[in-house]
Structure formats: C-alpha cells, structure tokens
Amino acid sequence: MVKKNFIPSVSLVRRDLPTLVTTTTSSTALSKPTSSVVSETSSKSLPSLTSSAFSTSSGATSSSSLIVASITPPSTAGNPFILNAADKPNGTVYIAVGAVIGAIFISILIWWLVSSYLSRRFTMTNSYANDSKNLYRGHHKHSSSLQSNPFDINDEKSYMQDDWDSMSQLESSQYEDAASPFNPIQDPFTDXRRSLFISPTLQVSQYEKSHSRHQSKDTNIFIDDPSLYVGTYLEEEEEEERKLNLNRPQRAASPERKEKKINSMEGYHKRNQSSLGLIPVASATSNTSSPKKAHKRQAPSMFLDDVLNGREII
C-alpha cells in the first residue's frame, strides 16, 4: 500500500486592516463665535483607502470680549511737578555730572595756582629782606632803598643795629686774632724745634678758650678809638705769659693752614716765644732775649694728661 503525502487544505481568508480613527479639535478666538468639535473618522482598507469625515456644528453661538487698558503718560503742559524734557538735549544727566566734576577740578587748579603764587611772593619777600640786611652799610647809603621797600622804621632800626654789631665784632676780632689756634707754615724764619711732640688737644683747647673769652666780652658796644682797650688787652697777654710754661713743647704747623697777616699773629708769638711768621725786629729780639724763669722740665705725656684733666691751662 503506497502512502501518499497528506497535504491539509488551508483556506486563506482575507481580512481588513484595523481602521484608524483620528479626532481633531479646533477653537477660534474669543471674540468670534466658537465652533463645535469636529470629529473625523476614516476607514481604510487595502489596497484602497476610504475615508469619511463628518462635521457637525451647533446651532447656538456665544461671544466674549477682553478690555485692555492703554497707558498714556501725563501731559507736562502746565504741570510744575514734571520736568518738561521735550526741549532738553539728550544726556542731560551726564552733562550735569560732568559739569560738577569739571568744576571740582577747576577749583583745585585755581587753589594750586594761588598757593604757588603766594608762596613764591613770600619767598621773594624774605630773600629781599635778607639781601637788604646783608647789603646794608649805613643809613645814608641805603635810605632810599629802605624807604621804597614795604618795611617800617623798626625794621630799618633793626638792620642798623645788626650792622653796628657786626662792625663791633669785626673791630674786636682784629685784636682777638692773637688767640687764634691756626699756625702758618709759609715762613722763612721758622724756629728750630727742640721737641717732636705734637699735642692733638692744643688746637681744641685754644679754640674753646678764645670762644669763652669772646662770649665774656660785650660785643654790642662799639668803641671808635681802639687805643682805649689796647692796654687792657696787653695786660691780659702778659698775665697769660706768666701762666704758660715756656719750656713745654711747641706746636707743629699743619700744611693745610694758610698764612695770616703778621700783625694778627703778634699775640700768638708773644705767648709761645716763637718768631714764626715774624720779621726779626727790635721788639721780637728783646722779647726772646729776656731771661726765662727756671721751670722743672715736664714730660710730654704728663703735660697731655694735665691738659685733659684740666690741671694745666693752655
């Protein structure tokens, strides 16, 4: 028995695709009548697609309105509380701020110019007063210049008094040059030194002594005749000669000192028994040939210690 392949029969039934239903809703503006919902239903089938739409509208209509307020600025005409900027340029605020800043800078510049001018004027006035004080040499010589300047009579008197004092000090310094601590070196009549000792404190001590003597005198009184006080000066010199130890070492001349006049060094040579810077005359030879008092010879170091301790007067 021959078996045959059994093929079952299959019946194909054609089925349609599921239908798609699309619903759309549209609305109009509020001010216009609203329309009802429109539903559209489409049924499609393969291979042809059929669609059908159904629209219905309601018979009743409704209307709505919206009130919008418009903003209008108030008018500036006749209103004193509102600035009328219609005739003002653009950027008025910036212009005002810039003007204020510029005014501040201009005021600072003016203040600086005025202060500089006043300071310069004050400096010129002081310098003119100092020049007038230094150049003034008598009432009749500069009376016209003093009358032309803006100073009163008190300033003129003070200038005269200062000039008088300076002249008095000049006259008195001519007779006090003998106590000068300086020593000339350009002298052909240099005396041979007996010792090589050089005192480092001699110059300072002589300066302090001359300074104290100068302060003790009244330099504000001017004496026209110098011969009235020459005798007193010579007596002081003789007293100093008696106090000085003539056997002590002499002072060495410094190469940095300048030569002075001979008449201003007479007192120095009298005290130190030296002919340095002097032309040998009869008075100098008589002074040097006078007998000396016998003194005990003192070592240079002991003499320096006495000077530093104040026991020795220079």
Curated annotation (Swiss-Prot):
Main location: membrane
Subcellular location: Vacuole membrane
Membrane topology: Single-pass membrane protein
Keyword hit for Phosphoprotein: yes
UniProt entry keywords in alphabetical sequence: Membrane, Phosphoprotein, Transmembrane, Transmembrane helix, Vacuole
Residues that span the membrane, as ranges: 93-113
Sequence ranges of Basic and acidic residues compositional bias: 254-269
Sites bearing Phosphoserine, chain numbering: 148, 254, 274
UniProt similarity note: Belongs to the PRM5 family.
Protein name in the entry: Vacuolar membrane protein VIN13_4115
